[in-house]
Design a protein with these regions (language model features):
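Conserved ABC ATPase "signature" region
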Residues: 2-22
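Helical segment within the ABC ATPase nucleotide-binding domain
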Residues: 66-78
Length: 140
């Protein structure tokens, strides 16, 4: 990518992740949430079809978590980016994901369609409790 084009794209991504007003600040002064968004911009500059996020909100303050979740949801729903989102926070998973895999010791216990849960007026936590607290039957 030519320098001018790279700079333009970088500026666009910084704006997209909400850091355009932080450009003069050294990255060492960024909060954990800001660093997560900067890392996301770094990945997005490569135009991926899929991104893998492993516990992306860990260490981020509650306000920053909500902001980051909204950004991920926007990338997935509006931009059509495939996001593999690994988290122990069911509320975050429910906001971001279309399908959820429940794993234990590296084994898939269930693959859940979030639209189906909504139709049944169930919460992801109900399914989670079924498998992990009640010893529910595994679906392989």
């Amino acid at each position: 990518i030519p320098d001018k084009e790279a700079k333009t794209k970088a500026m666009e991504l910084m704006k997209r992740v909400g850091l355009e007003d932080q450009l003069a600040k050294k990255t060492g002064k960024y909060s954990r949430g800001m660093r997560q968004r900067l890392g996301l911009a770094d990945v997005l500059i490569k135009n991926p079809e899929i991104i893998i996020l492993d516990e992306p909100t860990s260490g981020i303050d509650p306000a920053g978590v909500q902001e980051f979740i909204e950004l991920i949801r926007w990338l997935s729903k509006e931009e059509g980016l495939t996001v593999l989102f690994s988290s122990h926070h069911l509320d975050q998973v429910q906001k971001v994901c279309d399908r959820v895999g429940l794993f234990s010791n590296g084994q898939l216990l269930a693959l859940i369609d979030m639209a189906e849960l909504k139709d049944k007026k169930q919460e992801l936590s109900d399914i989670y409790n079924h498998y992990f607290e009640e010893g529910g039957e595994r679906h392989e």
